[in-house]
Regions:
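Metal-dependent phosphoesterases centered on the DNase I-like endonuclease/exonuclease/phosphatase
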Residues: 127, 137-178
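Active-site-proximal beta-strand elements of phosphoester/diester hydrolases
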Residues: 1-14, 86-91, 114, 124-134
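Structured beta-strand-rich core segments of catalytic domains in phosphoester-bond hydrolases
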Residues: 38-125
Length: 178
């Protein structure tokens, strides 16, 4: 099984020559070229999700962090010929994970998107967790990881788990040790 994580950079008008409209073809070609079984995507807006669905060969799960269907979010792309989704969900990395919310020290709302999958040739389910942790506060990153461990405790205990994403942290930071 080949897996990847990819921060595709949010679509923003401030990027000028690096706007999504100029990058989307190359990003989708790259994703298709590597023929991953599964790829976790960060910093994706609804228009980018539409493009990923239209121009890649993958099935796409997605969730956005504002709770209004318009904001930045996460996606999990998977190849249905290799991987089957069994269950999926998402929650906020905050003190109220089941409703749109923000950690008090975070720069913006953050979410975790998860999926329970199995390979089409195997019968063993595995858990995939996609995150994009806070870019401002180390404490918010730790708190976010704690929420993930609490919300998915039973699944993590039961299934092999892949935690993927953009941690916004250096390799020696405490968030990598949880």
């Amino acid at each position: 099984m080949k897996i990847a994580t990819y921060n595709v950079r949010v679509d923003t008008e401030y990027d000028q020559d690096w706007q999504w409209s100029f990058r989307k073809e190359a990003v989708c070609q790259l994703i298709n070229f590597h023929d991953w079984s599964l790829c976790c995507i960060q910093e994706v807006r609804p228009n980018q999700v539409r493009d990923l669905k239209a121009y890649t060969t993958f099935t796409c799960l997605s969730a956005e962090r504002e709770g209004d269907g318009q904001g930045e979010g996460l996606a999990i792309l998977y190849n249905e010929q290799k991987i089957q989704a069994i269950d999926t969900g998402y929650f906020w990395l905050s003190e109220t994970p089941q409703q749109p919310s923000i950690h008090p020290e975070a720069g913006c709302p953050r979410i975790a998107l998860w999926g329970l999958f199995k390979e089409t040739t195997q019968n063993t389910p595995f858990l995939v967790i996609n995150v994009h942790l806070d870019h401002i506060s180390a404490h918010a990153r730790l708190a976010g990881m704690t929420v993930i461990l609490e919300e998915l405790h039973d699944k993590i205990a039961q299934y092999p788990t892949l935690l993927m994403g953009d941690f916004n942290a250096e390799s020696g930071e405490e968030v990598h040790q949880l």
